Regions:
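A glycine-rich, hydrophobic/aromatic-adjacent loop/helix-cap motif
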Residues: 1-155
Length: 155
């Protein structure tokens, strides 16, 4: 399966930490998508957030007509054990199949979605409370957040 990475996965070194068995690391372009800092991370990210200045957003992607997104592409065998860890780590994302210029088949992209859809599809109330509610977080997908400063060191 081909993964389209846009944050830390733009680095082959970081991608290999996530998917040790990846093959064919290269760049690609997604038309109609853009990067956005639009959601709060879970409890592990509490130490990098600055709530008072709203500098607490993690990177995600969203559809946007006319935009183009450079991504890292990597082929990851479906039997790769690290898939399970990846899905757990990226729990709050919507996994979507996207068309990539020059690829005969879609790639998987971690995309933004709404709190309502996230809670309805992937994170029922008890799970949401465990991940976010106990820390006073009532919504994670927002459009007024600023990037957590830690992320900006990569740009």
């Amino acid at each position: 399966m081909t993964v389209a990475g846009f944050g830390a996965l733009l680095s082959e070194r970081s991608s290999r930490m996530t998917f040790p068995a990846l093959r064919n690391f290269r760049t690609g372009r997604l038309r109609g998508w853009r990067r956005v800092f639009a959601h709060r991370g879970g409890a592990p990210f509490r130490h990098i957030e600055r709530v008072e200045t709203k500098e607490m957003a993690s990177l995600s992607c969203e559809p946007h007509a006319g935009s183009e997104l450079v991504v890292a592409l990597m082929d990851v065998p479906l039997e790769e054990p690290s898939w399970a860890d990846f899905v757990v780590r990226e729990h709050e994302y919507r996994f979507v199949a996207v068309a990539v210029d020059g690829l005969p088949r879609p790639a998987v992209l971690c995309a933004a979605w709404t709190d309502e859809d996230y809670r309805r599809v992937r994170c029922p109330d008890a799970e949401y409370h465990r991940r976010y509610g106990q820390y006073g977080i009532d919504r994670i997908w927002r459009d007024y957040l600023l990037p957590a400063r830690l992320y900006l060191r990569h740009w």
